[in-house]
């Protein structure tokens, strides 16, 4: 049988799935640092070049829910081949593009092709290994999920500075070709052809919600959020789509996502924690480079190198997770991850303008360990009680909500950073004006012109200090929020240890 053949070849299949997932997650962040170079190369305006990122995010968000249904119709292997092949070819075309419209079109193709890689690879790995091996398997899979966004900015900065911005896309070619070759050689053909009714209304309303919501989150910072008519329209469309999708899910005979997913307490609770962990990882990674570059004067490449310890901590945690779960259990390991994550954010809340790189490196290392200890066990717990036939839809829903949660986290943190920076500056500025007694006396002694210049310099320093206070406040709040995960983790059920169930593909056909 095809499933038995995959069991015999699960080591090379797992390696290929890791490569495909890493390629997908890497591409979500690697292009960020190359945007200024792309902008200059294709002569685009600042608000235009951001579509290189926006187009990819929206295409992925729209296609991801549909990928499960397509894979059931044509088979997983064909879906993987089409997705990896399409993603690899689109990456090559992005690197060869000569103008902005070409890059945006090819990035859309990238997003459409790569949307299925993360959820589908997780589904296959859940099928290939027994429940008792899930901690080890999910730690391997989580490595690709976490190392992509961590390594992306560093690798992107190095490629851009030493080669060209085009290499942030060309880097996908060897990865994609290797994954294609291994899957073609070792993964068994499956016929697909499952006749599950397609919920057209559910898909259209979900697409409306996800597309409008992602567009709102991506465009918000540059459009003054709800000071812009565009954002109000996008928010209205997102709410309308969510409302209609909810009604359709509750009333349809065959909804787009099975209602049984919401009845599994472990899946719902684990998904909530997973969303938060993803938001924590991505939002921290989103603001730390700007902190190091704008306040500490690091270059883009230096800030990337300073993030390497997060990856090192993650790698160590991936090695430790199976051992800790075997000795302590999944929930204690997860709680240990909460402790490390909270400690790292508390360390970050003590950042200051005169700090050395040591604290950045240490806090990043601790956070890498903490997030790694949380990511793999929560993935295991989430699917421990979920019926095999629900895994394809479950992994797709989890990937989609994790992506949305990360986008929400990044947007909230960035919006809070702007408002808190302004608040911090205003509080500091209240105490220093041209009429401040000590300052007024000094101005009289050195002359009004020099005094005014000194006041401008002082206000610039106060702006930097106000922004520093904003970062510290945000990290402190994030540390507090991490602690709120503890009650939710405690109610999760321990996964049963049993023989591997039939794979989702076989369970669905029964």
Where do the language-model regions lie?
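Transmembrane core module of solute transporters
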Residues: 8-68, 101-103, 142, 163-164, ...
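Alpha-helical transmembrane segments of multi-pass secondary-active solute transporters
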Residues: 49-50, 79, 137, 168-171, ...
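Helix-loop-helix hairpins in multi-pass membrane proteins, especially solute transporters
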Residues: 64-202
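Transmembrane-helix signature of multi-pass solute transporters
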Residues: 86-96, 175-182, 240-244, 316, ...
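Short helix-capping/hinge motifs at transmembrane helix termini and TM-loop junctions
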Residues: 98, 130, 186-189, 221-222, ...
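C-terminal membrane-cytosol helix-exit motif in multi-pass small-molecule transporters
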Residues: 174-191, 208-219, 237-251, 485-493
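Hydrophobic transmembrane architecture of multi-pass small-molecule transporters
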Residues: 178, 401-494, 499-510
């Amino acid at each position: 049988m095809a499933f038995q053949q995959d069991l015999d070849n699960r080591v090379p299949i797992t390696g290929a799935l890791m490569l495909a997932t890493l390629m997908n997650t890497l591409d979500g962040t690697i292009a960020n640092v190359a945007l200024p170079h792309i902008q200059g190369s294709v002569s685009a305006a600042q608000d235009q070049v951001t579509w290189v990122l926006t187009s990819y995010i929206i295409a992925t968000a729209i296609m991801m829910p549909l990928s499960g249904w397509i894979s059931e119709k044509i088979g997983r292997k064909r879906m993987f081949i089409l997705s990896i092949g399409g993603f690899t070819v689109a990456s090559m075309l992005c690197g060869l593009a000569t103008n902005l419209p070409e890059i945006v079109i090819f990035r859309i193709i990238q997003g459409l092709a790569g949307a299925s890689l993360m959820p589908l690879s997780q589904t296959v790995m859940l099928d290939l290994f027994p429940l008792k091996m899930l901690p080890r398997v999910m730690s391997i899979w989580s490595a690709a999920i976490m190392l992509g966004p961590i390594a992306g900015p560093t690798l992107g900065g190095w490629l851009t500075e030493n080669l060209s911005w085009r290499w942030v896309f060309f880097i996908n070619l060897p990865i994609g070709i290797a994954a294609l070759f291994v899957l073609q050689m070792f993964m068994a053909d499956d016929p697909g052809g499952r006749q599950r009714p397609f919920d057209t209304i559910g898909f259209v309303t979900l697409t409306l919600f996800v597309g409008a919501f992602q567009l709102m989150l991506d465009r918000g910072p540059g459009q003054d959020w709800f000071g812009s008519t565009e954002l109000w329209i996008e928010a209205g469309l997102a709410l309308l789509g969510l409302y209609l999708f909810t009604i359709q899910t509750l009333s349809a005979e065959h909804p787009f996502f099975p209602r049984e997913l919401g009845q599994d307490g472990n899946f719902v609770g684990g998904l909530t924690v997973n969303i938060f962990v993803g938001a924590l990882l991505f939002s921290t990674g989103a603001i730390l480079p700007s902190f190091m570059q704008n306040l500490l004067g690091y270059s883009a490449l230096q800030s990337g190198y300073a993030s390497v310890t997060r990856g090192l901590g993650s790698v160590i945690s991936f090695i430790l997770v199976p051992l800790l779960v075997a000795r302590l259990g999944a929930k204690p390991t997860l709680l240990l991850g909460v402790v490390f994550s909270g400690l790292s954010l508390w360390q970050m809340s003590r950042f200051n303008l005169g700090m050395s790189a040591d604290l950045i490196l240490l806090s990043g290392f601790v956070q890498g360990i903490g997030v790694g200890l949380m990511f793999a066990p929560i993935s295991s717990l989430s699917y421990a009680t979920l019926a095999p036939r629900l895994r394809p839809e479950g992994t797709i829903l989890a990937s989609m909500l994790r992506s949305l949660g990360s986008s929400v986290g990044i947007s909230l943190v960035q919006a809070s950073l702007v408002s808190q920076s302004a608040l911090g500056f205003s509080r500091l500025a209240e105490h220093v004006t041209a009429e401040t007694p000590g300052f007024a006396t000094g101005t009289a002694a050195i002359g009004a012109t020099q005094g005014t210049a000194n006041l401008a310099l002082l206000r610039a320093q106060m702006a930097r200090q106000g922004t520093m206070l904003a970062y510290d406040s945000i990290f402190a709040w994030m540390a507090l929020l991490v602690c709120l995960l503890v009650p939710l983790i405690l109610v999760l059920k321990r996964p049963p240890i049993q023989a591997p169930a039939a794979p989702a593909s076989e369970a669905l056909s029964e």
